[in-house]
UniProtKB/Swiss-Prot annotation:
Protein name stated in the entry: UPF0473 protein Cbei_1107
Similarity field: Belongs to the UPF0473 family.
HAMAP family registered for this protein in UniProt: UPF0473 (MF_01448)
Matches recorded under InterPro entries: UPF0473 (IPR009711)
One Pfam family cited in the UniProt record for this chain: DUF1292
Source lineage: Bacteria, Bacillati, Bacillota, Clostridia, Eubacteriales
Length: 92
């Protein structure tokens, strides 16, 4: 994935591509994973979603939404909050 990408298209449950605005991209070495936090580009919402990035056999990015009740999600959330705090973008 282009780490500077502002938008990505992620298929919904019906297979329709939905445009998401990338809030932040980061890697977590401990999990050996790449992640984005993104929000739907054309919706007025305060909700953001965490996605893990995989590659398919053609090398294209596949974005898998993380469930908010697992350990990986918790680590991603902690990393996101730390990065945003370091950048001064959120306050505790």
């Amino acid at each position: 994935m282009d780490k500077e990408a502002k938008y990505v298209y992620i298929p919904d449950q019906e297979g329709n591509d939905v445009k998401f605005e990338v809030i932040i991209y980061f890697e977590i070495e401990k999990l050996k994973g790449q992640y984005i936090i993104a929000t739907p580009a054309f919706e007025e919402t305060d909700e953001a979603y965490a996605f893990k990035i995989f590659k398919d056999e053609d090398g294209s990015d596949i974005f898998i939404a993380l469930e908010d009740d697992d350990e990986e999600f918790e680590m991603v959330l902690e990393t996101y909050e730390t990065l945003m705090n370091e950048d001064g973008l959120i306050e505790e």
